[in-house]
Amino acid sequence: MSLLEGLALFLLLLSGVLVVTLRNAIHAALALILNFLVLAGVYVALDARFLGFIQVIVYAGAIVVLFLFVIMLLFAAQGEIGFDPLVRSRPLAALLALGVAGILAAGLWGLDLAFTQDLKGGLPQALGPLLYGDWLFVLLAVGFLLMAATVVAVALVEPGKASRAKEAEKREEVAR
C-alpha cells in the first residue's frame, strides 16, 4: 500500500466515523462531504474519472444538499415544538438499524463479491448495462431508502404544522 492509498484510507475511515459520531448535524454533513470527496479522488486514482465526477456532482452536491434540507426541517420542528421530535423514535431506529444490518449480513454471507468486470474507466457505456442488469435491485433499494428517509423526515415535521393551521382556523371561526 502506497502512502497516498494509506492517506485516502485513513481519511475515509476518519470522516466516516465523524459522520456517525458528531453531535452537530451540520458538522456531520461536512464530514460526509469530505468522505465523498476523498472517495471521488480514489475513483479518479483508479482511472474511473466518470465515477469520480459523478461522485462529486451527485453525492457531494445533490445528496448532501438534500440531507442538509432535511436536517434544517428537523431543527425547525425542534424549535417550534420545544423538544426533539426524534427522542421517542431513537430506540426503534436503533432496533431497525440492527435488523437491517442483520439482514444485510445474512444476505452477504457466503457470496462471492469479487468484482471482475472491466468497467473501461467508469464510462457510462460500461456502467449502464451493469447497473440496470446485475445490480438493478441494489440500485432500486438505495433509491427507495433515500426516498423513504426523506418522506419520514418530512412527515416528522408536517403533523405539527397541520395541527397549528387547523387550530388557527378554529380560532378564526370562533372569533366570528
Curated annotation (Swiss-Prot):
Coiled coil: none annotated. It comes from the Bacteria. The chain crosses the membrane at residues 2-22, 26-46, 56-76, 91-111, 137-157. Its main location: membrane. It is an enzyme of class 7 (translocase). It is a multi-pass membrane protein. One of its GO terms (cellular component) is plasma membrane. InterPro entries: NADH_UbQ/plastoQ_OxRdtase_su6, Nuo/plastoQ_OxRdtase_6_NuoJ. The keyword Membrane applies. It catalyses: a quinone + NADH + 5 H(+)(in) = a quinol + NAD(+) + 4 H(+)(out). Its EC number is 7.1.1.-. NDH-1 shuttles electrons from NADH, via FMN and iron-sulfur (Fe-S) centers, to quinones in the respiratory chain. The immediate electron acceptor for the enzyme in this species is menaquinone. Couples the redox reaction to proton translocation (for every two electrons transferred, four hydrogen ions are translocated across the cytoplasmic membrane), and thus conserves the redox energy in a proton gradient required for the synthesis of ATP. Belongs to the complex I subunit 6 family. NDH-1 is composed of 15 different subunits, Nqo1 to Nqo15. The complex has a L-shaped structure, with the hydrophobic arm (subunits Nqo7, Nqo8 and Nqo10 to Nqo14) embedded in the membrane and the hydrophilic peripheral arm (subunits Nqo1 to Nqo6, Nqo9 and Nqo15) protruding into the bacterial cytoplasm. The hydrophilic domain contains all the redox centers. This is NADH-quinone oxidoreductase subunit 10. The gene is nqo10.
